[in-house]
């Protein structure tokens, strides 16, 4: 019956949320446990076998920093606290944040950090010809993928919101005194959710390195950034979870050092509507609805996490062919794509990172 079908869909969404909460709890362990095996001399000559590790809930996800350099624990705590600092700059929903004030026309003067990240977001919006668009905020706020009862927004609301999506109408300027300004039409809403975690990870890495950390792993809910090597001439091993796997199965194990691994896909946040239709969180700025894609996961290997964060989403929205074409045009970037049928695509040198 219709009621039974609705109850089935409700139960499936509840089960997904339970699994999502559990996966958030174990995500850092899954990825970082792989980096701790075997338990021998992880790091440089003066590093620890068992890392100084702190886990906290920040940025709506579980954050873990594990330092194999023997530093005071207060350094790790201060590094994690940077998540709060940057959330108060980049959050679209936090009323006290700088971006919230920009979106609500409370200010046109912006900080160096917000200027830098918006500029980066606009660069990738241009690179994708608008397939990725940081002004998607007017649409993304209609879709609440974190709700206990998510639903599809009314079509008229989506249609209206699309009138306020166009990255080309955002202008950044800096005056002779070095003060940054932003200008965009009323009703526009910038959403930096697809790029902020990578930027924050890079800033945390800089802080840790400046404080003497030579070997560490930063994990911001799956955005993984390594500092240095596991030990001299030995890479870290990063396990990339297979999309939609309930058993913790890995898509790949990657050997990397002093680099970033970032994945984006349809499995991160999604729900099923009353008729059983699958909706994921990567929205098309042209239609206002989730992208219909042959891809379910894009994993980027890069030196900087900001680059990986931006490219993982950009390549997903471009699709397999154009996304891989973009990767091949960039120096120092590798990618692994997974299609919905389980087929994996590798950029030219991506396989060199795969653990044999």
Locations of the language-model features?
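Single conserved hydrophobic/aromatic residue that forms the stacking wall/gate
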Residues: 1-11
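Mature catalytic core of soluble alpha/beta enzymes
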Residues: 13-356
């Amino acid at each position: 019956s219709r009621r039974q079908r609705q109850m089935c869909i409700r139960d499936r969404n509840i089960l997904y949320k339970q699994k999502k909460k559990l996966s958030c709890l174990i995500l850092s362990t899954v990825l970082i446990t792989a980096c701790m095996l075997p338990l021998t001399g992880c790091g440089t000559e003066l590093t620890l076998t068992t890392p100084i590790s702190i886990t906290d809930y920040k940025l709506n996800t579980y954050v873990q920093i594990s330092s194999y350099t023997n530093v005071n624990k207060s350094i790790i705590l201060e590094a994690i606290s940077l998540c709060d600092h940057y959330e108060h700059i980049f959050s679209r929903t936090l009323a006290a944040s700088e971006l919230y004030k920009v979106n609500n026309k409370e200010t046109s003067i912006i900080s160096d950090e917000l200027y830098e990240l918006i500029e980066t977001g606009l660069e990738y919006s241009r690179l994708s010809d608008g397939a990725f668009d940081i002004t998607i905020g007017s649409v993304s706020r209609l879709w609440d993928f974190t709700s206990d009862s998510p639903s599809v927004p009314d079509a008229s609301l989506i249609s209206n919101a699309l009138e306020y999506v166009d990255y080309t109408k955002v202008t950044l300027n800096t005056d002779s005194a070095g003060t940054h300004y932003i200008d965009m039409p009323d009703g526009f809403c910038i959403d930096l959710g697809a790029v902020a975690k990578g930027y924050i990870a890079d800033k945390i890495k800089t802080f840790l390195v400046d404080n003497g950390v030579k070997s560490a792993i930063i994990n911001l809910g799956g955005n993984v950034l390594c500092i240095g090597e596991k030990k001299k001439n030995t890479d870290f091993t990063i396990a990339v979870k297979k999309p939609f796997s309930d058993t913790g199965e890995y898509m790949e194990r990657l050997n990397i050092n002093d680099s970033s691994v970032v994945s984006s896909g349809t499995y991160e946040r999604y729900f099923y509507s009353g008729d059983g239709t699958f909706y994921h969180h990567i929205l098309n700025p042209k239609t206002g609805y989730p992208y219909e894609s042959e891809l379910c996961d894009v994993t980027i290997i890069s030196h900087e996490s900001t680059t990986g964060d931006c490219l993982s989403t950009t390549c997903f929205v471009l699709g397999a062919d154009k996304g891989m074409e973009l990767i091949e045009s960039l120096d120092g970037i590798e990618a692994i794509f997974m299609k919905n049928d389980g087929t994996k695509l590798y950029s030219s040198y991506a396989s060199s990172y795969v653990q044999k």
